[in-house]
Every structure is written in C-alpha cells, then in structure tokens.
C-alpha cells in the first residue's frame, strides 16, 4: 500500500492509501475516501502579505510597515498557527482580527445562526466574490445550530457565488451547523479530530389558532423533507438511511462524520 501526499491550494495536505497512487489536485478531488486523513495543519493563507508591505510573526518579531501600501497589508502568521490579534497601529488605522480574516478570505461562524449572523456571513461571501471570483473562500465553523431559514440562506449564497467555499469544523457542528459543514464544496470539507457533529430533524414551536398550528406543522414537515434530501445529496447516502439518522439527535465523532460522508477529511492534531 503506497501513501499519496496531496498539497491543495488552500494549504492543506493529506495522505490517502491507494493501490495505484496518482497525483491529483485538491479542487478536482471530489471522491470521498474514508481512509483520508490530513497530516499537516492548515498552512498560513497569508503568502502574499510581504508583497503588501506588512508582515508579522507570532514569535514576537517586530512588525515592518511599508508606507507605500499601508492600507492593504495583512498578517503573516507562522505556518500551522491561526491568525493572532496584532497589537499594532498601522498608517491605515488599527488592524483587528476580523479584518485579518476577511482579507485572507476566511469567514468564521462561532455562534448560533440567526438572521443577523446570516446577514453578516452573506455580506462577506458576496463581497469576497465580487473582489475575486476565482479564489477560494474558507469557512470555519464552531456552531451549535440556528434558524433553518437563516442557514438555508447562507447555503444558497455559498452555492450561488463563483468562488468555491470550503468548510472546516472544530468544537461542534450541530443541527443546522452540520448542514453548513456538509454543504461546503465537495473535497473541501474538513473537521478537527475532536469535533462533534450532530444531525437531527428541524425543531420548531407552534402556537396560535388551530389552523395556524396545522400550517406551521406542515411547514416543519416540508423543511425536514428538504433537509433530508440535502443530506442525501451531500453524503451520497440513501434517503432512507439519512431519515433514520435524523429521526432523533444523532451524535457523530469526526471519524464517523467522515465515514457517513458529511466531511471529506480530518485535520490531524497531537491528540
């Protein structure tokens, strides 16, 4: 059994066991293999920051600023480490963490998704697509769920824009957060090894007149059927198996999510 190392454009590399290894690109690799495992952490996406004139290092090296392009500098963190909040004032103003993430085409969702969160994420997706419709976007998820309508709005935007949107989960991707994780570009959906994924049928509350309650129940049933069909398309699993999994809260480890087809690979950490 030979080991195949792949270095994708997003800075991920993983190994796959196959009898006839063939080099392949990350973006064109859409077939899932439950044996795949990421063997290196996400590399820094800030490769062009030196060209912009602003660079930093998490070890505490002094920051260098080029006054010729002060407003477009980005942070260059040590490879394998996440962006670090810079304590620096630049000629273009204070540089905050959200700006660093946005300039490097990274979207972070770390809370339940409601209408306000969906508006922010959709605005970021559309803006990044209008700036550059050829470069990929990376979405980090530590999300316990949220509004079905809001999550479907984000997914529709992810599917509509031209850039490919990869997803990476850590912590928890539950309920509609799991739907977003699975709805990322096929071949670009990942999770940390300690991530917990939970899928289930949509939850709703009903109230009002009897006729109003009946209509709300019908809407919830329709939402469940739609989401089950989406999971079946995302995972390649039969619809009957998806319905069995979503009948009640189904908790999955990262490895089980990989086997089920919700993700395409695992990011490897020390433990």
UniProtKB/Swiss-Prot annotation:
Which enzyme class? Answer: hydrolase
Mention one GO biological process in which this protein takes part, according to its record: proteolysis
| Catalytic activity of the protein | Hydrolysis of proteins to small peptides in the presence of ATP and magnesium. alpha-casein is the usual test substrate. In the absence of ATP, only oligopeptides shorter than five residues are hydrolyzed (such as succinyl-Leu-Tyr-|-NHMec, and Leu-Tyr-Leu-|-Tyr-Trp, in which cleavage of the -Tyr-|-Leu- and -Tyr-|-Trp bonds also occurs)
Q: Which UniProt keywords apply?
A: Chloroplast, Hydrolase, Plastid, Protease, Serine protease, Transit peptide
| Induction, as annotated | Repressed in darkness. Induced during cold acclimation (at protein level).
Write down the HAMAP family for this protein, in alphabetical order.
ClpP
Q: What does this protein do?
A: Cleaves peptides in various proteins in a process that requires ATP hydrolysis. Has a chymotrypsin-like activity. Plays a major role in the degradation of misfolded proteins. Essential protein required for chloroplast development and integrity.
Record-given protein name: ATP-dependent Clp protease proteolytic subunit 6, chloroplastic
């Amino acid at each position: 059994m030979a080991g195949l190392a792949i270095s994708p454009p997003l800075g991920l590399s993983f190994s796959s066991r196959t009898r006839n290894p063939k080099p392949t690109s990350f973006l064109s690799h859409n077939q899932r293999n439950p044996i795949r495992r990421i063997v290196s952490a996400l590399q820094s996406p800030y490769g062009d920051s030196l060209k912009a004139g602003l660079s930093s290092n998490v070890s505490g090296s002094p920051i260098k600023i080029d006054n010729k392009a002060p407003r477009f500098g980005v942070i260059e963190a040590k490879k394998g480490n996440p962006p670090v909040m810079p304590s620096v004032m630049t000629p273009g103003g204070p540089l905050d963490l959200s700006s660093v993430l946005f300039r490097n085409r990274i979207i972070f969702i770390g809370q339940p998704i409601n209408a306000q969160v969906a508006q922010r994420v959709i605005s970021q997706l559309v803006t990044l697509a209008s700036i550059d419709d050829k470069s990929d976007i990376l979405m980090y998820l530590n999300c316990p769920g949220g509004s079905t309508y809001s999550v479907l709005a984000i997914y529709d935007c992810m599917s509509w824009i031209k850039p490919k949107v990869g997803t990476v989960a850590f912590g928890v991707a539950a309920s509609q957060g799991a739907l977003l994780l699975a709805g990322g570009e096929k071949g670009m959906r990942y999770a940390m090894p300690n991530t917990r994924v939970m899928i289930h049928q949509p939850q709703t509350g009903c109230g009002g007149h009897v006729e109003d309650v009946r209509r709300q129940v019908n809407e919830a049933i329709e939402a469940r059927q739609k989401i089950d069909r989406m999971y079946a398309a995302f995972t390649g699993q039969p619809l009957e198996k998806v319905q069995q999994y979503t009948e009640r809260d189904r908790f999955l480890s990262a490895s089980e999510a990989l086997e089920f087809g919700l993700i395409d690979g695992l990011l490897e950490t020390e433990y």
